[in-house]
């Protein structure tokens, strides 16, 4: 039956009835068909995902990868979707939107078979592989001869206890819940599930980014505390707000590339104590300083023996040691070589309008970046005198 006929049957007085399971499934099918040319079946006895926030999660991952991949990184992108569900929504969207390849895992045989059917009817069997797992298996499967996964994504089950799920089913906040027990309940809830991924991730550091999307704001502090406890400093928080629904994504990586501020630090400050360090510093330049800024920056870099190159209007900095601190200068005076204080870091300097920006691009130690910015700020102040 054509989608538009199904939509007509699901709309009353110009509105979608979000308490009607058939209406929810029909809306999802219509959006996927119209916006992504995807034909997807949502079985009546399984979770029907909200397409807009799923698509936003995929876009977020694309932006995350784009902001932390060098120009030479043109390799195949392979995503792992843990608990892909009957709809197989994330792999289908990822393949359609960005031509990613995917492996999806599923513990439920019915959802596994339905996901495979959705893949086949969209002719994506060469891009998407679904793997049937058990609850006892680790969450990160072997690559089975393929390249390592580029990223991991997951919507963990929300609830820790069955009674919480039953109460939610009876009193949902804004619409009917079509999910079944194994899709909504897990030991430890979504925090426990994310912590399992975190534990396993320490043995798979070649994966560029791990991500989890949470339905409870209270889960964010618990997971960030665990990341900090494990000394994982390259992490981020991202808030999705679509209509009345809010979701939170936490990402982490064992690699050195640093994402843009807007991908790891929400504009809302309610979780600010759990934010990672800023990766962008700004200084406002007065007209006189702005006119001299190129000479000032090059003198600062050359005087401190900081390697740099210019690409258009951007100064690219790549250091292997700290040469700008007072301690480094004392050491260099007593030695014939440059200071051996460790300080591997890459950053970019750029002037936009009357703003000097310093963007942290790569590095493991925030203190090195902060120290560089402090030295640069002193140089700017000295030139204002």
Swiss-Prot record:
Entry's localization field: Cytoplasm; Nucleus
EC number: 2.1.1.346
Principal location listed in the UniProt entry: cytoplasm
Signal peptide: none
Residues the record lists as binding S-adenosyl-L-methionine: 54, 83, 106, 155
GO biological process, one term: mRNA splicing, via spliceosome
A cellular-component GO term for this protein: nucleus
Keyword ATP-binding: no
Keyword annotations of the record: Cytoplasm, Methyltransferase, Nucleus, S-adenosyl-L-methionine, Transferase
Reactions that this protein is recorded to catalyse: adenosine in U6 snRNA + S-adenosyl-L-methionine = N(6)-methyladenosine in U6 snRNA + S-adenosyl-L-homocysteine + H(+)
Protein origin, superkingdom: Eukaryota
Alphabetized Pfam families for the sequence: Methyltransf_10
GO molecular function: U6 snRNA (adenine-(43)-N(6))-methyltransferase activity
Alphabetical list of Gene3D superfamilies matching this protein: Vaccinia Virus protein VP39
Family: Belongs to the methyltransferase superfamily. METTL16/RlmF family.
Biological function: RNA N6-methyltransferase that mediates N6-methylation of adenine of U6 small nuclear RNA (U6 snRNA).
Name of the protein in its database record: U6 small nuclear RNA (adenine-(43)-N(6))-methyltransferase
């Amino acid at each position: 039956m054509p989608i538009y006929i199904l939509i007509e049957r699901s709309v009353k007085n110009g509105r979608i009835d979000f308490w009607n399971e058939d209406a929810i499934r029909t809306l999802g099918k219509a959006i996927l068909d119209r916006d992504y040319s995807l034909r997807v079946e949502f079985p009546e006895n399984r979770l029907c995902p909200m397409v807009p926030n799923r698509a936003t999660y995929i876009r977020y991952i694309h932006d995350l990868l784009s902001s932390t991949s060098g120009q030479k990184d043109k390799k195949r992108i392979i995503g792992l979707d843990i608990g892909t569900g009957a709809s197989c929504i994330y792999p289908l969207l990822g393949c359609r939107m960005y031509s990613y390849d995917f492996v999806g895992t599923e513990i439920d045989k019915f959802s596994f078979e339905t996901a495979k059917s959705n893949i086949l009817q969209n002719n994506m069997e060469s891009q998407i592989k679904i793997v049937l797992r058990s609850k006892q298996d680790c969450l990160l499967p072997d690559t089975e001869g393929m390249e390592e996964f580029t990223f991991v994504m997951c919507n963990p089950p929300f609830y820790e206890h069955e009674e919480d799920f039953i109460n939610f089913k009876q009193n949902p906040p804004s619409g009917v819940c079509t999910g079944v027990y194994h899709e909504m309940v897990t030991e430890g809830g979504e925090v426990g599930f994310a912590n399992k991924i975190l534990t396993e991730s320490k043995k798979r550091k070649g994966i560029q980014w791990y991500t989890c999307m949470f339905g409870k704001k209270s889960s964010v502090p618990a997971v960030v505390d665990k990341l900090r406890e494990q000394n994982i400093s390259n992490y981020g928080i991202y808030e999705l707000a679509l209509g009345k629904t809010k979701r939170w994504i936490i990402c982490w990586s064992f690699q050195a590339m640093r994402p843009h501020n807007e991908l790891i630090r929400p504009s809302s400050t309610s979780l600010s104590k759990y934010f990672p360090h800023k990766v962008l510093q700004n200084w406002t330049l007065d007209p006189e300083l702005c006119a001299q800024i190129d000479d000032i920056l090059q003198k600062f870099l050359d005087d401190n023996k900081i390697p740099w190159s210019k690409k258009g209007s951007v100064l690219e900095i790549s250091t292997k040691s700290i040469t700008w601190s007072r301690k480094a200068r004392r050491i260099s005076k007593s030695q014939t070589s440059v200071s051996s204080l460790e300080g591997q870091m890459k950053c970019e300097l750029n002037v936009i309008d009357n703003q000097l920006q310093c963007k942290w691009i790569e590095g493991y130690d925030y203190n090195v970046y902060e120290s560089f910015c402090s030295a640069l700020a002193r140089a700017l102040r000295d030139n204002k005198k």
